[in-house]
Amino acid sequence: MSRHLETSLNNKEFVLNSLEKGLRLDGRQLSDFRSLEIQFGKEYGQVDVSFGHTRVMARITTEITKPYTDRPFDGIFSITTELTPLAYSAFEAGRVSDQEIVISRLIEKAVRRSNALDTESLCIISGQKCWHVRASVHFINHDGNLVDAACIAVIAALCHFRRPELTVVGEEVTVHPVEERVPVPLSILHMPICVTFSFFNNGELAIVDATLEEEDLCNGSMTITLNKNREVCQIYKAGGIIIDPSKIISCAKTAFDIAVSVCSVIQQALDEDLRKKETQYLGGSAENERS
């Protein structure tokens, strides 16, 4: 079984002393997020997110199924994550780790419980048929802050995804291929963004977007999920350290600035990809007309 290698005492002392002086190994300030890159695939709902050496891919798929009996007017949203040795040698293949469970629950709460995805719009026939939206998250490389990376990937993929158009006559549902009718975007009401803080010196020092080495040395962490409208969706704290309420408020203010910036990057990437796809679609249509 592959085990995680602990940081040496010299490296630990160097990193902690640097953080106390407001310095980080990659040159960032304590409240700086790494440069975010978002690339969409050829199909709707495929996205590749990376910052630093952390890289995550997400894919959205849908199928028509029966809604839950206690929610006959709602569709279904689910998320699956996959942590394998491909991303980090300490992860075990075929085994669901506690970290994987935490990530799945945090993202599921961020999307579904905050009503970011309008599940009522996924209803086709009440109590009989609805859309089941699945988000599959694959971690390609782990250099810290997997929660934030997974959240950004899922939100970007949901905003990018298009489902087939439907025609409903009575209880008969017809699914139109994308070649026949323009696919329909999901109803996304807002973009919840996870921002994770790592704490040192028993909670007195907080940093944003920790690298893997910084995560190994921290006393605990806290993830704040919020959107650009200053609405806090959830707060999750890992670790037994006590965090002063004033520190939480300070972190929330920092998280808001980061969330606004991340939403802007996501929207810009979406707009650019949409323009590319429209150009390809129009070019393909013109080619078909000439032939």
From Swiss-Prot:
One example of a Gene Ontology biological process annotation: nuclear-transcribed mRNA catabolic process, 3'-5' exonucleolytic nonsense-mediated decay
Alphabetized InterPro entries for the sequence: ExoRNase_PH_dom1 (IPR001247), ExoRNase_PH_dom2 (IPR015847), ExoRNase_PH_dom2_sf (IPR036345), Exosome_comp_Rrp42_subfam (IPR050590), PNPase/RNase_PH_dom_sf (IPR027408), Ribosomal_Su5_D2-typ_SF (IPR020568), Rrp45 (IPR033100)
Any GO MF annotation of the entry: 3'-5'-RNA exonuclease activity
Keywords tagged on the record: Cytoplasm, Exosome, Nucleus, RNA-binding, rRNA processing
Gene Ontology CC terms, in alphabetical order: cytoplasmic exosome (RNase complex); cytosol; exosome (RNase complex); nuclear exosome (RNase complex); nucleolus; nucleus
Subcellular localization, as worded in the UniProt entry: Cytoplasm; Nucleus, Nucleolus
Main location: cytoplasm
Nucleus in keyword set: yes
SUPFAM superfamilies xrefs: Ribonuclease PH domain 2-like, Ribosomal protein S5 domain 2-like
A Pfam family assignment: RNase_PH_C
Subunit structure: Component of the RNA exosome complex. Specifically part of the catalytically inactive RNA exosome core complex (Exo-9) which may associate with the catalytic subunits rrp6 and dis3 in cytoplasmic- and nuclear-specific RNA exosome complex forms. Exo-9 is formed by a hexameric base ring of RNase PH domain-containing subunits and a cap ring consisting of csl4, rrp4 and rrp40.
UniProt similarity note: Belongs to the RNase PH family.
Function: Non-catalytic component of the RNA exosome complex which has 3'->5' exoribonuclease activity and participates in a multitude of cellular RNA processing and degradation events. In the nucleus, the RNA exosome complex is involved in proper maturation of stable RNA species such as rRNA, snRNA and snoRNA, in the elimination of RNA processing by-products and non-coding 'pervasive' transcripts, such as antisense RNA species and cryptic unstable transcripts (CUTs), and of mRNAs with processing defects, thereby limiting or excluding their export to the cytoplasm.
Name of the protein described by the UniProt record: Exosome complex component rrp45
Organism, scientific name: Schizosaccharomyces pombe (strain 972 / ATCC 24843)
